[in-house]
Design a protein with these regions (language model features):
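Peripheral interaction segments used for macromolecular assembly
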Residues: 1-73
Length: 73
């Protein structure tokens, strides 16, 4: 499944709680700006759904946090 990842999209946990917004996209990775906690990177394969309004994505329960990708396009 291909996702139109772009800054500003909301990011939700598998339970439906908003955890932040996409701050940056590098290739198949995106950075989540999470209020009250450090920002983190997630790989697009960890997305399980998009919101009906196409303004957000939901992450898998076991989504892994990654270091910033160096040379992703």
């Amino acid at each position: 499944m291909t996702h139109d990842l772009r800054p500003g999209l909301r990011v939700y946990s598998h339970a439906g709680l908003e955890i932040g917004r996409i701050a940056e996209v590098r290739g198949d990775f995106f950075k989540v700006n999470a209020p009250r906690r450090p920002d983190f990177w997630v790989q697009a394969i960890d997305i399980i759904a998009e919101t009906q309004a196409h303004d957000g994505v939901m992450l898998r329960r076991d989504a892994k946090h990654h270091a910033a990708p160096e040379h992703a396009e």
